[in-house]
Amino acid sequence: MKNFRSHASILQYPNDCFYKNDLEACGNQHTNAFIGSTILPNPNYPIIFHAIPGLDQREANSPSFFNVDEVLQVKAYAEELHRLGAGENCVSWPKALRLNDLTVPDDVGIITPYHGQVLKIRKALATTAMSGVKVASVEEYQGQVWKMYIPL
C-alpha cells in the first residue's frame, strides 16, 4: 500500500504495528523537506515528540477537557514556526519549507482530541500572526491534508 503523505520514519510505527509492513513511503520532496533541519532534535527524523506535563481541566459548564500547559506550548511552537518561516533566521529551515513554499499559517494544522482544547488554542492564537491556523478536533481533520501538523 503506497503512502504519499508521510516520511518513512513517521510511517514506521503504524507500518510495523498495524499494516504488517505493507505500507510503502512514496512521498515527494515535501515529505523529506525537514531532513537535516537544525530545529529537529534528530536531523534524520522529521518529527518532534514533546512530553508536556500538565493537568487536564474542565470549565464548570463543559464536559470537554483542556490543558493550559499544552495550550501554551502549542502557542510557542506556532509562533516559532511563523518567526522562522517568515524569514527571520529561516536559514536553518529547509528551502522547501521556507515561506515561499510553506504558507504560514495556511499550511499548518493543529489537531487535538478535545473541543475545549480547540477553543483554548484558538483563543491563545487569536492575537498572534498564527490566528489563521486551522485548529480542530481529530474528527474535523478527517481526510484533510496540511504540510505541517502540530498534534496533541
Question: Where in this protein do the model-derived segments appear?
Answer:
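Helicase-core coupling region on the C-terminal RecA-like lobe
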Residues: 1-80, 144-145
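A short acidic (Asp/Glu
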Residues: 9-12, 116-123, 146
